[in-house]
Amino acid sequence: MIKFDLNNRVAIVTGGAQGFGLAITERFIESGAKVVIWDIDEGEAKKALEKVNSENLTYQIVDVSNYETINSKLSEVEKSHGKIDIFINNAGVAGMNTTVAEYPIEEWNKVINLNLNAVFYCCKAVVPFMAKNDYGRIVNIASIAGKEGNPNASAYSTSKAGVIGLTKSLGKELAQKNIAVNCVTPAAAKTRIFDQMTE
């Protein structure tokens, strides 16, 4: 396994208590980073702390669909850790497994709000914190569904396509600064979102 040197780096991982988020958190801790998990499920966040068992890992309960909360929690991290180097936008939901014609509008909006709008909110809020130190790395977790468009998963596919477009736009906007913005598009993996899709 390739080793990365993240000593003295401060990272935030949204949805970091389980699934991809927890795997990312564990790898960052192994690489020397200080990590703050953002999750809405305190029970899972506490389990993650017990599993990882590192003094470099903490958590905050954060609703990433609330822009004011995001700004407030970023300020808390900056105050406690001195800076924010890395931000991983990982939190998300699968949404309903149904056709476009039968997709309830309210449920569609929930998926778009958490999977796309929340990523925009977090990116918008964290960039000024990174710009202060002329350094930043933002990674947005999308999905192969955002490229291919999965049947019976229109809201999820659309939200992840939006994340890909947002990542490209923001990356170009910050190209002259020392803030890199990238996107990862995983295929299916056995996570809570996978379970939601196959219920």
What annotation goes with each model-predicted range?
Residues 4-35:
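Canonical Rossmann dinucleotide-binding motif of NAD(H)/NADP(H)-dependent dehydrogenases/reductases
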Residues 98-100, 107-109, 194:
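Substrate-binding pocket helix/loop in short-chain dehydrogenase/reductase
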Residues 123, 159, 167:
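Active-site helix of classical SDR
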Residues 42-43, 61-73, 105:
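The beta1-alpha1 cofactor-binding region of Rossmann-like NAD(H)/NADP(H)-dependent oxidoreductases
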Residues 128, 172-176:
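Alpha-helical segment proximal to the catalytic Tyr-Lys
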Residues 97, 101, 148-154, 176-177:
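Active-site loop immediately N-terminal to the catalytic Tyr-X3-Lys motif
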Residues 143:
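Residue(s) in the substrate-gating loop at a strand-loop-helix junction
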